[in-house]
């Protein structure tokens, strides 16, 4: 059985979050949680929350055994980008791009 969890509009770029997602793809969930707990990246905190949600979904909705679960699918898509203006010298302005991402984690016991 499979359980899914998503975090949409997560702050942070998808490119940076994919670095974390690539580290835990295909691992057992207990090993993945250990890796995420000691990762210094901001995206690791976001991915860990989504993974914990997927584990809770599998346990509550499907009645799965937590010790059997593995991460079968994890991917990070681009979300909408917010455009902001930063004033600069001599009346100029720079555009700031505040990127968001959509994090999806699927766990399975097979």
Swiss-Prot record:
Can you name one GO molecular function term for this protein?
structural constituent of ribosome
What CDD domains is this protein classified in?
Ribosomal_L22 (cd00336)
Do the record's keywords include rRNA-binding?
A: yes
Read off the Gene3D superfamilies from this record. Answer: Ribosomal protein L22/L17
Q: Does the keyword RNA-binding apply?
A: yes
SUPFAM superfamilies in the cross-refs? Ribosomal protein L22
**Functional note:** This protein binds specifically to 23S rRNA; its binding is stimulated by other ribosomal proteins, e.g. L4, L17, and L20. It is important during the early stages of 50S assembly. It makes multiple contacts with different domains of the 23S rRNA in the assembled 50S subunit and ribosome. The globular domain of the protein is located near the polypeptide exit tunnel on the outside of the subunit, while an extended beta-hairpin is found that lines the wall of the exit tunnel in the center of the 70S ribosome.
* Family stated for the protein in its record: Belongs to the universal ribosomal protein uL22 family.
* Subunit composition and interactions: Part of the 50S ribosomal subunit.
- Give the protein name, as stated in the record: Large ribosomal subunit protein uL22
Q: Which organism is it from?
A: Pseudoalteromonas translucida (strain TAC 125)
Q: Which gene encodes it?
A: rplV
